[in-house]
Curated annotation (Swiss-Prot):
One of its GO terms (cellular component) is photosystem II. This is Photosystem II D2 protein. It is an enzyme of class 1 (oxidoreductase). The keyword Mitochondrion does not apply. Photosystem II (PSII) is a light-driven water:plastoquinone oxidoreductase that uses light energy to abstract electrons from H(2)O, generating O(2) and a proton gradient subsequently used for ATP formation. It consists of a core antenna complex that captures photons, and an electron transfer chain that converts photonic excitation into a charge separation. The D1/D2 (PsbA/PsbD) reaction center heterodimer binds P680, the primary electron donor of PSII as well as several subsequent electron acceptors. D2 is needed for assembly of a stable PSII complex. It comes from Agrostis stolonifera.
Length: 353
């Protein structure tokens, strides 16, 4: 029996090889296979956002002005969510709602679903871009893995949360003031600040900022003076074999400050990766819980005692009253189509309100 070893010869003009060669060619801006997803989706998402904030009103969906054309500025303009009556419709331009009419599509809030979906796929494309480039230059894929944190937060807040509610209407609109309003909504209707997943998210993000500041300052403090350049950036050769700063000195310094310190660069930098990414993922999990209307911590005993004893009040009971006030005001303001009217006797009252 004869065994032939070797590769099966391919056709000279193989389409896949031709595309692979062009897409992954070394150029100023790398394209890659991931670019087929990233660049079109990012272009449409940003283009839709700029179009919406410049020209498109929210009068038909929220009863608001939301564009530069109507007098808004960068902080108050937004691409707002579709009307509550449209539920979870994808609002395709050629769908039954707009029927190919671009103006009507914009009035109904079609730009929001357009920006949200293209934005989500653009973020996924950017993550794949990091995987692809890491594989090309033989790096580990931790950059891409880290970027899963922001993707998880975006998908949970803009897509999963409104899918768990009655419609896209309850997602955040794409604008600065609109996001602030959404944060107030989360607090009033879900008591988000007392949610343990939010607490873990805050600990992760602020802890990462602290770690970043400490790490940057420590490296600057322990740089070796082995260059004669005028500043840090010109004093070192990017191909030098020696380390740029003294890990031993840094370890000794923080050992004296705290009693403990990182003694290993790998563990130090993995910890700096782990803290923010875990925080973002915990926040995303918490928002998925809110989509299902899971509650935060409830200290019912304090609420009962506060109701029975006018002299007893805690920061928790004050916040619960404040949340009731947010709901009573925001529900009527935010959902005018419901024609909500709250009589005086149901509005929250407290010792300090």
């Amino acid at each position: 029996m004869t065994i032939a070893l070797g590769r099966v010869p391919k056709e000279e003009n193989d389409l896949f090889d031709t595309m692979d060669d062009w897409l992954r060619r070394d150029r100023f801006v790398f394209v890659g296979w991931s670019g087929l997803l990233l660049f079109p989706c990012a272009y449409f998402a940003l283009g839709g956002w700029f179009t919406g904030t410049t020209f498109v009103t929210s009068w038909y969906t929220h009863g608001l002005a939301s564009s530069y054309l109507e007098g808004c500025n960068f902080l108050t303009a937004a691409v707002s969510t579709p009307a509550n009556s449209l539920a979870h419709s994808l609002l395709l331009l050629w769908g039954p709602e707009a029927q190919g009419d671009f103006t009507r599509w914009c009035q109904l809030g079609g730009l929001w679903t357009f920006v949200a979906l293209h934005g989500a796929f653009a973020l996924i494309g950017f993550m794949l871009r990091q995987f692809e480039l890491a594989r090309s230059v033989q790096l580990r894929p931790y950059n891409a893995i880290s970027f899963s944190g922001p993707i998880a937060v975006f998908v949970s807040v803009f897509l999963i949360y409104p899918l768990g509610q009655s419609g896209w209407f309850f997602a955040p609109s794409f604008g600065v003031a609109a996001i602030f309003r959404f944060i107030l909504f989360f607090q009033g209707f879900h008591n988000w600040t007392l949610n343990p997943f939010h607490m873990m998210g805050v600990a992760g993000v602020l802890g990462a900022a602290l770690l970043c500041a400490i790490h940057g300052a420590t490296v600057e403090n322990t740089l070796f003076e082995d260059g004669d350049g005028a500043n840090t950036f010109r004093a070192f050769n990017p191909t030098q074999a020696e380390e740029t700063y003294s890990m031993v000195t840094a370890n000794r310094f923080w050992s004296q400050i705290f009693g403990v310190a990182f003694s290993n660069k790998r563990w130090l930098h993995f910890f700096m990766l782990f803290v923010p990414v875990t925080g973002l993922w915990m926040s995303a999990i918490g928002v998925v819980g809110l989509a299902l209307n899971l509650r935060a911590y409830d200290f019912v005993s304090q609420e009962i005692r506060a109701a029975e004893d006018p002299e007893f009040e805690t920061f928790y009971t004050k916040n619960i009253l404040l949340n009731e006030g947010i709901r009573a005001w925001m529900a009527a303001q935010d959902q005018p189509h419901e024609n909500l009217i709250f009589p005086e006797e149901v509005l929250p009252r407290g010792n300090a309100l």
